[in-house]
Swiss-Prot record:
The keyword Lyase applies. Glycans are attached at N172, N365. The N-terminus of chain A is blocked. This is P-(S)-hydroxymandelonitrile lyase. PROSITE patterns: CARBOXYPEPT_SER_HIS. SUPFAM superfamilies: alpha/beta-Hydrolases. Pfam families: Peptidase_S10. Keywords: Disulfide bond, Glycoprotein, Lyase, Signal. The lineage of its organism: Eukaryota, Viridiplantae, Streptophyta, Embryophyta, Tracheophyta. Residues 1-34 form the signal peptide. GO terms for molecular function: hydroxymandelonitrile lyase activity. Its EC number is 4.1.2.11. Heterotetramer of two A and two B chains. The A and B chains are linked by a disulfide bond.
Length: 510
């Protein structure tokens, strides 16, 4: 019902007609109000109506995690966890675990989304529990230890289990488990939009996307950037890519080169691999490449490909290893963790996250819809993965052209996505070099090299010394420094020039 009132007459002239009209208007408005037909006042542009604000606050409070089983004392930061529905029709929802910044002024700290790749591996079980999260799982699988180098000491960290089908995240529609790169990026963007609607006070924070996936991170970054003018506003500033496949052709060459240079494969296998594998897909390799790859794995023996110079776990293989071996028909030991050194650390996380009281505290699997035991990676997602880009260089060019902060890093003991692969792929971008390859240190006065770096126009590459595929696992201090430098937009610290000795100035070895 709409009521339109028109009046005539000059201002300041009260007549019987206007008096009657006013009386009639008041009567009509009173009747409309009594019938509930009047609309509420329109809220200010950009501000949700009051009842929406109350709903947001209630959702936040419902997601608040007061504490976790076995949690140590001294935890001063807030935590939230729960589900964000991204498709009502299919019943598709992603799980998240959010940790507020453990800083003097968390309200001023940036927001960082962390994703693990695989595809199909858990950002909670790997990223949060083994790499950069505030806790480490004790060897008893029931209690937690504080992580001295937790990344939430510099930023608010949001871990998301994506896509649906990765452990706690789920869908009521089985076809949703057949994923691909583009669908993954769009689903995760939808998650972000809805998460920001639930936590609107983070909309204008500096926002970054980070993780261990050369596909998920740049592809999601591209979607976020292209939707920069849509609502809600996301203050997207840059991306941090770890150990990521970038260009299948260059990555494949770099892989066989590293295997050979480290004495892991024969001359014949290197030559065969360089002949038949470049140009094939990592996710869907040709039979010819698979045959050579299997020969290479047999020659390597029982090593951990994610960190080739550390001992392997003597327990059953972890699902995480299938990301590397499964396309070629072989399993291998699980990823490692330092410090303290524990080659079977992944099983501590598996035990802890399967405890019913832990899942209850995390607000995970509250309906019991996830019937299978929690595991670090989803074989279903990995085995059914479809569309996978073979070249991410055009995406990088677009993001660099947009002026976003772009950093890439990888460990030098990783044989899965080795330094040689990443450097070849980045070289293919043909970016001008701002600062040539140099050693960096944990502080300008440190004598021991922390790693190496090169700065291009629009992109920075960092290689922490002695790190494997999961850089924060093996070199947590270096990884944390790298993260802080990335957030500040500052290069890795170089040693003062006058502290560097030329070969002629060094003492003899005898």
């Amino acid at each position: 019902m709409a009521v339109f009132i028109s009046s005539s007459g000059s201002p300041g002239r009260a007549t019987a007609t206007t008096t009657t009209t006013t009386t009639l208007l008041l009567a009509v408005l009173a009747a409309a109000a009594a019938a509930g037909l009047l609309l509420a006042p329109v809220a200010a542009r950009g501000s949700p109506p009051e009842h929406d604000k109350q709903l947001q606050l209630q959702q936040q409070e419902d997601d608040r995690i007061p504490g976790l089983p076995g949690q140590p004392n001294g935890v001063a930061f807030g935590m939230y966890g729960g589900y964000v529905t991204i498709d009502d029709n299919n019943g598709r929802a992603l799980y998240y675990w959010f940790q507020e910044a453990d800083t003097a002024d968390p309200a001023a700290a940036p927001l960082v989304l962390w994703l693990n790749g695989g595809p199909g591996c858990s950002s909670i079980g790997l990223g949060a529990m083994q790499e950069l999260g505030p806790f480490r799982v004790h060897t008893n699988g029931e209690s937690l230890l504080l992580n001295e180098y937790a990344w939430n000491k510099a930023a608010n960290i949001l871990f998301a289990e994506s896509p649906a089908g990765v452990v706690f995240s789920y869908s009521n529609t089985s076809s949703d488990l057949s994923m691909g790169d583009d669908k993954m990026a769009q689903d995760t963007y939808t998650f972000l939009v809805k998460w920001f609607e639930r936590f609107p006070h983070y909309n204008y924070r500096e926002f970054y996307i980070a993780g261990e996936s050369g596909h998920f991170i740049p592809q999601l970054s591209q979607v976020v950037y292209r939707n920069r003018n849509n609502s809600p506003f996301i203050n997207f500033q840059g991306l941090l890519v770890s150990s990521g496949l970038t260009n299948d052709h260059e990555d494949m060459i770099g892989m066989f080169e590293l295997w050979w240079h480290h004495g892991l494969i024969s001359d014949e296998t290197r030559d065969s691999g360089l002949k038949v594998c470049p140009g094939t897909s990592f996710m869907h390799p040709t039979p010819e490449c698979t045959e050579v790859w299997n020969k290479a794995l047999a020659e390597q023996g029982n090593i951990n490909p994610y960190t080739i110079y550390t001992p392997t776990c003597d327990r059953e293989p972890s699902p995480y290893q299938r990301r590397f071996w499964a396309p070629h028909g072989r399993a291998a030991p699980p990823p490692l963790m330092l410090p303290p050194y524990d080659p079977c650390a992944v099983f501590n996380s598996i035990n802890y996250l399967n405890l019913p009281e832990v899942q209850t505290a995390l607000h995970a699997n509250v309906s019991g819809i996830v019937e299978y035991p929690w595991t670090v990676c989803s074989n279903t997602i990995f085995d059914q993965w479809g569309q996978a880009a073979d070249d991410l260089l055009p995406v990088y060019r677009e993001l660099i052209q947009a002026g976003l902060r772009v950093w890439v890093y990888s460990g030098d003991t990783d044989s899965v996505v080795p330094v040689s692969s990443t450097r070849r792929s980045l070289a293919a971008l043909e970016l001008p070099v701002k600062t040539s390859w140099y050693p960096w240190y944990m502080a300008p006065t440190e004598r021991e090299v922390g790693g190496w770096s090169v700065q291009y126009e629009g992109l920075t590459y960092v290689s922490p010394s002695g790190a494997g595929h999961l850089v924060p696992v093996h070199r947590p201090a270096q990884a944390f420094l790298l993260f802080k430098q990335f957030l500040k937009g500052e290069p890795m610290p170089a040693e003062e020039k006058n502290d560097i000795l030329l070969p002629s100035e060094k003492a003899p070895f005898y």
